[in-house]
Structures are given as structure tokens and as C-alpha cells.
Amino acid sequence: QISYEIDKSIFFITYFFAPLAYVHFFLYLCSELQVMAVESNCIMEFSAQQIAMLLGGKVTGDADRKVSDIGSIENAKEGQLTFLCDAKYINHLPTTNASVVLMTESIDFEGETNATIIRVENARAAMGQLLSLVAKAINPAKQGVEQPSFVSEGVVIPEDAYIGAFAYIGKNVQLGKGVQIYPHTYIGDNVKIGDNTILYSGVKIYYNCAVGKDCILHAGAVIGADGFGFEPDANKVNQKLPQIGNVIIEDDVEIGANTTIARAMMGSTIVRKNAKLDNLVQIGHNVEVGESDFLCAQVGIAGSTKVGAHSIFAGQVGVAGHIELPDNCVFGAQSGVSGNIRKPGMYQGSPAIDAMNWRRSVIGFKNLPDIMSKLQNIEKKLQ
């Protein structure tokens, strides 16, 4: 493994006084050299002041304090960076061994701590920015076509794209700049893949489907398999209804491992931009998932349902077909959504109802044996 020796004094001057745009470029260059990789032999240190400049934060404490790694606030060690975004964890701040703590500026703390604090508007989001840099260093973008792989004649492969071994690229496929197609991936005929999209190993994209820019599809995701469409004939034999539509995944969508999105019977199954789907999610044919929706593991949405934007579906939520849900809804774990929802809000239970009413109902159900016993006693007295 090649190690890169960096003159720390030159780096400090360059980084500390450079404009923010140049800082981003320099960090990108560092990631390309893989000097930031956690498992590398060459570990780069950053001061609290440098991190604050990058994130637009304000330093309290020793601005020259150095960090070269990341840890949780409970278990962090000297030389590590951590973050605090929720006041309920404030009790860890006086005792943490972390050298630097990113803290949401709205959290009130007047106590003492050995850590240097960087106050930012949103510590979780700021930590995300830093983790993005580390992630690019740990798993940098690749280029080139590995063999054996199959690319259909006439498919144009951008110079900065990567196609892993045993990948299959069908006819008339359009690949955007910087796409990353990992080994054992299947891309059917007439598929479009947008710029900088990542398809991890084992992703399957059926014919005529489209994936936008800056998307991430994790291992085993299946896009465009036939929707579950059948019709019994006069003899009650299930006859298949051909699914001739497609799937459209818009920009900045992330799809978890082993999630399946069925192709439309006619038209398109659509996942709107910035939606995030967890592992093991099932999306039926002709469904529309709204912009910036969160779908947690084992959510299932039946065919032709339209989901509004900015909604959250907790684990194992089931949604019936041919219904409409508005924007800004939250459905608690294991809820069963059996009909149209008219207004935004929090819903729970099966069938899903207003979450507050559901909590009252649960309390009533829990007390039902006692209530029945009291009613029986009253009945006996009246006889």
C-alpha cells in the first residue's frame, strides 16, 4: 500500500487560509489519494478550528485540539470527534473522552467538559457532512470495466464510470457520468441510469426502467419485476395480466438491500426524488412514492396507491391498494392503512387511526378485563 507523506505545516497554511471552495477541493483531493482512510497507514489530523471553518461552526475551548477519528459520545477516546444533537444525552458531555464535540447550538450547556466544543446549527447534519468525506475515502469511486463482464454493442461507457466483473449491460442502455456498477449487477435493455448513481452488487434492473442521478441501490434490490397482476377466468384459474409498464426512480433516491419495486401494468411505478427506502421494502405496481418519503424495513404498499410527500412509514406498515395518502403523514410501526387518509397527521394501529385516539383505545383494551368484571358484578347485583 502506498503511503503519502504530507508536510503538515504546508497543509495547515493551505487549508486554514484557503477559501471554502478550495477547502472542499483539497479535501476531495485528499480522499482521492486515500490519505483519510480509517484503515490507511497514513492518518490525517484536523484541528477543531479547521473543522469549524468547514462547517461554519463556533469553537469553545482549545481551537488547536486535533482529531483523526470518529466515535460515539459515550465511548469516544482522546483524538476522536463526536457529536451531540439531542439534549437528553447532555449528561455524557462532562464525562466524554472525545477531544472535540459537535453540538447543536440550541442545546443549553453551562457545565464543564474537557472536550473542545464546536457549536453548529444542526450537529447531526454537520456530522453527516464529515462522514460523507470519510466514506468517500474509505470506498472511493472506481473507474474502468472489469473482466469478465458483458456490455452490449453500442453502449457508451463514460470515462469515469465503473463496471464490475460479471456485470451484464443490455442493449440501448444509457449510462450517466460517474456511475458505479458493482459486480454481478444486471441491467436490462433500454434502461437509463443517471449521473453518479451507485448500483451495488447483485442489483437487478429490468428492461425499460429508469434510475435518476445521485441514487444509491443496495445489494439485491430488484427494480421492474412484474407487478402482482392476475385475473381468474370462468374456471377460477388465475390468468396472468402482462405488466408492460416500467419503473421510474427520480434523482437522489436510496433503495435498501433486497427491496423490490414492481413494474407497472401500464404506465409507471414512480419513486419521487429524495425518497429513502430501507431494506426489504415491497412497492407494488403503479404505486407512486412521494418526494422525500421515508419507508422503513418491511413496509409494503399495494398496487396503484399514491403516497404524498414528506411522509414516514415505520417498520412493517402495510398499505392497501388503490388509495391515496396526503403529504406529511407519519404511520407508526405495524400500522395497517386500509383506506384513504384525508389529512396530514400521525396514525397508528390496524386499521390505522389518529395516533392519539389509538393510544386511548389501547389503554381501554388493556383495561377491558377489569371493566368486564365490574359490569358482571353490577349485573349480578341487579338480578
Which sequence ranges carry the predicted segments?
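Structural signal for interior beta-strand "rungs" in well-ordered beta-sheet cores
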Residues: 83, 144-354
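Serine/threonine-rich, low-complexity intrinsically disordered segments
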Residues: 4, 8, 12-18, 187, ...
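Terminal amphipathic alpha-helical/low-complexity segments used for targeting or macromolecular assembly
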Residues: 2-4, 8-12, 24-148, 160, ...
